[in-house]
Amino acid sequence: MPISQKNQNFIDRTFSIIANILLRIIPTTSGEKEAFAYYINGMSAQSEGNYAEALQNYYQAMHLEMDPYDRSYILYNIGIIHTSNGEHSKALEYYCRAIERNPFLPQAFNNMAVICHYRGEQAIQQGDSEIAEAWFDQAAEYWKQARTLTPDNYIEAQNWLTITWRSK
């Protein structure tokens, strides 16, 4: 097993242990604890590439979790899985739902921008420059929002915004 994979497995195991300890000691309702357990199980399955299992756990967590902030991270992770599966429309839907509950998720804005940029590139390959420009404009808006939330991140996005004259 490569060293990076061993390190990731160690980090995942450490996170799971700490999460289980916190789950026992933090005063929360049984529903909140159960939702968190499903969320952790979803993250574990996702990190192992078991996306179907991860989605099942995330959907269970969504059913139990009432806090909008916590729900935003569940929705965000569901979006990541749909992105990984090439289901970009579904991914955009889940990222939007995450942002509705927590507008301070720069990574969701970034992921939405990446999908829009990809769709713009696809439109160019299909010879539809008008549609491509619309997708690129949408990508620019999402990247601007991500950069507003975390100005020191997404440097490549800032470079793209600058060279395409979309930074303002």
From Swiss-Prot:
Q: What is the official name of this protein in its record?
A: Photosystem I assembly protein Ycf3
InterPro entries attached to this UniProt entry: PSI_Ycf3_assembly, TPR-like_helical_dom_sf, TPR_rpt, Ycf3/AcsC/BcsC/TPR_MFPF
Query: What is any Pfam family matched here?
Result: TPR_12
Give the bilayer topology.
Answer: Peripheral membrane protein
What disulfide bonds does the UniProt entry report for this chain?
none
Role this protein plays:
Essential for the assembly of the photosystem I (PSI) complex. May act as a chaperone-like factor to guide the assembly of the PSI subunits.
The answer to keyword Metal-binding applying to this record is no
Where it sits in the cell: the answer is: Plastid membrane
Q: Where are the TPR repeats?
A: 35-68, 72-105, 120-153
Signal peptide region: none
Question: Which Gene Ontology terms of cellular component type are present?
Answer: plastid membrane; thylakoid membrane
Say which species the protein is native to.
Cuscuta obtusiflora (Peruvian dodder)
Tell me its family: Belongs to the Ycf3 family.
Q: A biological process (GO) annotation for this entry?
A: photosynthesis
The entry's keywords: Membrane, Photosynthesis, Plastid, Repeat, TPR repeat
